């Protein structure tokens, strides 16, 4: 195997802890940063401490020069060490984690990533995207409608949410496998891969809960407020991911990479998908309609479960209070939706 791919296994615990020790040893003012000039001098004077050979030393010097004086935090340090040592897989993991992790949480996250054994591997959202695409293509062929913005809508599918199949509880989750329209399937897959996979890499099993709570909140909100139409599509799950990421950016604005650009782009991108959902609900030239409330349910779940699931390694008072408030609000949301769903049958 190519030497650059030799690090398919995780960095061992000794090497992982040594990276933290090295960084802290040379972070003399304990501000979480090492100045580039200082690090250049350090690696020349203490090459053995870094475990570098001559070639790796040259690469690190070049990478530091390319930073043009920008200080090195622990995330940058791990990324540069991986590049210099040819740990290609580790380099990709760190690069993905940089996009979704606030700077004040990176020491904990990157320390965990160094020991990450890819068990389970971060393929849940990749696999889900493949399944969604397969179902979309199947129903496109089966319906003979072709590829367009507002269809097909497989109303007879055993996966779709409908008020006529309330006892079939699996539909509250399986509807996310069916997508209506080419724009929706592209939007959902892009969000799941671009945002969801890095989040899954950092947060692992918590992302499964976040996604499916978004799906559940979307289905019960739709049945509560718009029961006369169908619900299908992965938008609730995708909106839970995008809402969670937007919440993280908003609450850690100064700590996120490119937050000023990323936040408005995400909001506009999500708004376009929701505008299309509103069009399909009220203005599309077809009899069978699809609810737009799945998006809103996913949005609510994404915001609330960000505080429930992602509290960081050192929870602050703000996150502790937010955790309990979000937990209570989630309970109220579910209770109110179930009451509204059950009310018509109870009144008759």
Curated annotation (Swiss-Prot):
Q: Could you say which residues bind Ca(2+) here?
A: 27, 29, 31, 38
Q: Which InterPro entries match?
A: EF-hand-dom_pair (IPR011992), EF_Hand_1_Ca_BS (IPR018247), EF_hand_dom (IPR002048), Peptidase_S54_rhomboid_dom (IPR022764), Peptidase_S54_rhomboid_met (IPR017213), Rhomboid-like_sf (IPR035952), Rhomboid_IM_Serine_Proteases (IPR051739)
Residue ranges annotated for the EF-hand domain, each copy included: 14-49
Q: How far does the signal peptide extend, from start to end residue?
A: none
Coarse class of the primary localization is: membrane
Subcellular localization(s) per the UniProt record: Membrane
GO cellular component term of the entry, any: membrane
The portions of this protein that span the membrane are 121-141, 177-197, 207-227, 229-249, 263-283, 290-310, 323-343
- What outcome is recorded for mutants in which this gene has been deleted? RNAi-mediated knockdown does not affect vulva development. Does not suppress ectopic vulva formation in a let-60 (n1046) gain-of-function mutant background.
User: Which cysteine-cysteine pairs are annotated as disulfide bonds in the entry?
Assistant: none
Q: What does this protein do?
A: Probable inactive serine protease.
Indicate the family of this protein.
Belongs to the peptidase S54 family.
**Which PANTHER family does this chain map to?**
INACTIVE RHOMBOID-RELATED PROTEIN 2, RHOMBOID-RELATED PROTEIN
Query: Mind telling me what this protein is named?
Result: Inactive rhomboid-related protein 2
Q: What is the lineage of its organism?
A: Eukaryota, Metazoa, Ecdysozoa, Nematoda, Chromadorea
Q: Which gene encodes it?
A: rom-2
């Amino acid at each position: 195997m190519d030497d650059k791919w030799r690090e398919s296994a995780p960095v061992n615990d000794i090497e992982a802890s040594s990276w933290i020790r090295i960084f802290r040893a040379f972070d003399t003012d304990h501000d979480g940063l090492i100045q580039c000039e200082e690090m250049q001098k350090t690696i020349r004077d203490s090459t053995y401490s870094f475990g570098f050979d001559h070639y790796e030393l040259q690469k690190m010097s070049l990478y530091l020069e390319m930073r043009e004086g920008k200080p090195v935090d622990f995330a940058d340090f791990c990324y540069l060490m991986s590049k210099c040592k040819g740990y290609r897989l580790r380099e990709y993991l760190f690069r993905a984690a940089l996009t979704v992790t606030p700077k004040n949480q990176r020491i904990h996250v990157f320390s965990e990533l160094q020991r990450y054994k890819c068990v389970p591997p971060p393929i849940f959202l990749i696999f889900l995207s493949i399944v969604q695409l397969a179902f979309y293509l199947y129903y496109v062929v089966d319906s003979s409608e072709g590829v367009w913005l507002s269809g097909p809508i497989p109303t007879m599918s055993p996966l779709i949410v409908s008020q006529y199949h309330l006892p079939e509880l699996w539909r509250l989750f399986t509807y996310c496998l069916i997508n209506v329209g080419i724009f929706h399937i592209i939007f959902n897959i892009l969000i799941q891969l671009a945002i969801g996979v890095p989040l899954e890499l950092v947060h692992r099993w918590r992302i499964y809960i976040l996604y499916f709570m978004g799906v559940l909140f979307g289905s019960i909100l739709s049945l509560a407020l718009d029961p006369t139409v169908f619900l299908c599509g992965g938008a609730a799950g995708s909106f839970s991911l995008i809402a969670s990421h937007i919440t993280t950016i908003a609450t850690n604005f100064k700590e996120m990479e490119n937050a000023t650009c990323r936040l408005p782009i995400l909001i506009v991108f999500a708004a376009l998908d929701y505008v299309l959902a509103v069009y399909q609900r009220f203005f599309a030239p077809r009899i069978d309609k699809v609810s737009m409330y799945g998006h809103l349910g996913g949005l609510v779940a994404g915001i609330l479960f960000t505080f429930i699931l992602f509290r960081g390694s050192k929870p602050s008072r703000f996150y502790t209070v937010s955790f309990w408030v979000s937990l209570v609000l989630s309970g109220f949301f579910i209770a109110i939706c179930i009451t509204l769903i059950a009310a018509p049958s109870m009144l008759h």
